[in-house]
Design a protein with these regions (language model features):
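N-terminal glycine-rich phosphate-binding loop for ADP-containing cofactors
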Residues: 1-11, 23, 46, 50-51, ...
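Generic internal hydrophobic packing segments that stabilize the cores of diverse globular domains
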Residues: 10-17, 33
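Gly/Ser-rich catalytic serine loop of serine hydrolases
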Residues: 29-39
Length: 564
């Protein structure tokens, strides 16, 4: 559709909502559960909005997550009902508001204990026995807008994500009454709907849904055994137990298991909050230094050192101890599975489940298969990924799989540029300006230059950079964990002298540095490492943090939103 078609559709809905608002009788709407976006915009046309006093009852405007603002009069009716501050924050932040908070801001008028009390509450409202919310005047609108703008500017640019800036301007207008706000809202929504940014965000929404659907199904896995209690293995075990699996955690170092369990406890206390739930979840995470759980596990996930011979020894031993029909998975980040499978009598049992660090935060898991892998095992691993609340993407075994195959050439190109005299701070500022969560040079320091070097050897990337990294490693400068790399570090903070750089030069640098990432994604699609360009884009969006407003690297590069 074009802007005119979008506007015509909106006017039709607005007319319907206005008819509700104009009814001569008292109108009451009852909310039981989640009521977001257009549903809540309709609710705002009623005289009284009553909800259930339960965490499941939530209202809000999530449109900002699609690069939009409410389109059916929500920004105007929310302003009239709640006042500037509450309306602005609801529209700008896009987070669902729970019932008690909604009552305090005027987003709801009244709460009842349960569904059975709704009819009685409606009768009371119709009789005038419930006091309607009254909009609260903002003491200093300019200060509010300025504070919100500063927060937005610290995270993004209007060229990348115009919607939050448009919303701030929308609520800064001199004519702040409901009807004028709704009129401006319609125009803004229609413009934003056609913007490259919103099209990109909406594509990410669709990709997210597509990937999650791939993880829905019966996995027939109740018991997961994890070998390796380091950061990756320990966190994989913790997340598995948190999602209902019985987990045994094995490591030669008992102290490593203890540390992993304590990290899990802290995670559960943050996420679950309820002490009984924390205790119950910890009971599903069992220390198993001798690996007794192997005999009864439905799925093994190996997360030991990224050394082929070490992994092969682990799997050769595990195969002898595991029951027939159980799945064996490696968390390797780059080693071809065929190399590891050579140690097995039955290589069809081996698949890859490549999680990303930190496991409790990053959503992607690459499910890796070889020509020998049992398709049923691959499917079940996809479903386990979904049960872990991850976004599983199927990848054929190949060096680096998809994410590291795309990411590392981009990082190494940045290192090449630094070796050739480019300013590391300018590189990192340019890519953060584009929307990456971190610049490639700082990322190399964060990951560890030793890790980067070894991955570069596996993938055969840039001999020049590998030699440079090897010299830095021999000098003891391996990045954040040594206190010095391309930057000096103070704990988790890079000590960078931040300069001011020409915007056009940074844009050109960004395009140049992203070229190998895009090339590798395209090659991976051509070689059927992933099934489609959609899946390549999804992997980069959810695994690398490629900016959502682009819709993914291939989608962006194919023309939409690409700078000329």
């Amino acid at each position: 559709p074009d802007e005119a078609a979008v506007t015509a559709h909106i006017h039709g809905v607005l007319n319907s909502f206005q008819q509700i608002e104009d009814l001569s009788c008292v109108t009451v709407i009852l909310i039981d559960g989640v009521c977001l976006g257009g549903g809540y915009e309709m609710a705002l046309a009623f005289d009284y909005i009553i909800g259930i006093d339960h965490p499941s009852c939530q209202v809000g405007f999530p449109e900002i997550n699609l690069g939009l603002l409410p389109g059916y009069g929500g920004s105007g009716r929310a302003f009239a009902r709640m006042g500037l501050e509450a309306a602005l924050k609801m529209v700008l932040h896009g987070k669902p508001v729970r019932a008690n908070d909604a009552l305090s801001t005027g987003a709801l008028d009244h709460l009842v204990a349960d569904r059975n009390a709704l009819a009685n509450a409606a009768r009371i409202a119709l009789g005038g026995g419930i006091e309607r919310a009254i909009a609260v005047d903002c003491a200093d609108p300019d200060a509010l807008i300025a504070a919100e703008r500063a927060g937005i500017e610290a995270r993004t640019r209007p060229e990348n994500t115009p919607a939050p800036f448009a919303i701030l301007d929308h609520y800064s207008h001199k004519d702040m009454n409901k009807d004028n706000i709704i009129e401006r809202e319609t125009k803004l929504f229609s413009e934003l709907m056609m913007s490259p940014s919103s099209i990109g965000f909406r594509r990410v929404f669709q990709l997210n849904d597509m990937v999650k659907k791939g993880g829905r199904g019966g996995h027939q896995v109740g018991h997961i055994h994890v070998i390796g209690a380091g950061v990756m293995g320990g966190d994989i075990a913790a997340v598995a137990a948190m999602n209902g699996f019985h987990v045994t955690l094995q490591d030669m170092n008992a102290a490593a298991i203890d540390g992993a369990v304590e990290r899990a406890r802290a995670l559960y206390e943050r996420r679950l909050k309820n002490p009984d739930k924390v205790t119950a979840t910890l009971e599903r995470l069992v220390a198993d230094p001798d690996g007794d759980g192997l005999a009864v596990a439905d799925l093994l996930i190996e997360a030991v050192a990224e050394v082929p011979e070490v992994k092969k020894a682990v799997f050769a031993d595990a195969e002898r101890r595991m029951k027939p029909g159980s799945i064996m998975a490696t968390n390797t980040s780059a080693i071809p599975l065929e190399d590891i499978a050579a140690a097995l009598d039955d290589p069809s049992r081996l698949i890859g489940m490549h999680f990303f660090n930190p496991v409790p935060v990053l959503p992607l898991v690459e499910i890796i298969y070889t020509e020998a892998s049992k398709i049923d095992f691959v499917d079940r691993a996809m479903f386990v990924g979904g049960a872990l609340k991850k976004q599983p993407i199927r990848c054929k075994s190949a060096p680096g799989f998809l994410v590291n195959r795309a990411l590392l050439p981009y990082v190494f190109k940045a290192i090449d540029a630094v070796i050739d005299g480019a300013n590391a701070d300018m590189i990192d500022q340019a890519l953060v300006r584009f929307g990456m969560p971190m610049g490639p040079v700082e990322l190399a320091d964060q990951v560890g230059l030793d890790v980067c070097h070894d991955a570069g050897v596996v993938l055969g990337i840039s001999e020049k950079s590998r030699k440079h990294l090897k010299a830095m490693i021999e000098a003891g400068t391996i990045g954040r964990k040594s206190g010095s790399g391309f930057y000096d570090w103070d704990g988790k903070k890079a000590l960078r002298a931040r300069g001011e750089y020409d915007a056009a030069a940074m844009d050109a640098m960004t395009l140049d540095l992203l070229a190998p990432l895009i090339d590798e994604c395209r090659a991976a699609v051509d070689e059927s490492v992933v099934e489609s360009a959609d899946m390549a884009d999804a992997a980069c969006l959810f695994g690398i943090g490629f900016p959502a407003y682009t819709g993914g690297p291939l989608f962006w590069h194919d023309g939409l939103g690409q700078p000329s």
